[in-house]
Amino acid sequence: MNIWNEIQNEVKLRIEAEPSLEPYLNQLILSQDNLINSVASVLASKLNSDALSSDKIKEFILDVYHKCDHIEEDLINDIIFFKDHDPACKYFSTPILFYKGFQGLATYRAAHCLWNNDRHTMALFFQNRASEVFGVDIHPAAEIKGGVMIDHATGVVIGE
């Protein structure tokens, strides 16, 4: 199974069911070349602030995701775990688009890579933004493998 193709097909069906969401779904999923770009676009749209624009955040996240080769596999395993274990999650695209637990975890994965590459200040920036936006506070030094589900996520704190 190619999860990216599956996600794109799901989103096309979702657009048929909810045409008013077409611009949103096109921007974040269908216009993206791959899963990494899509996740980075979603995170950038949520994490932007006065300190960093969404374009700059997307640029940072893409750079980090491409430098840490295991991140895409971890994200795929997280998405699959959500779909397989959360009865409310009917589509692979749902965690990417709508679940702040996944979005917080995806932000942590970027922060963790930054932390491991001695970019502690930027890692802490992303940790802080994830805490403010998603209610998920995961220390960038924490070790979390792929295939994790943080359901609902409000008030989750995971230390170093």
Regions found by a protein language model. Name each.
Residues 131-160:
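Structural signal for interior beta-strand "rungs" in well-ordered beta-sheet cores
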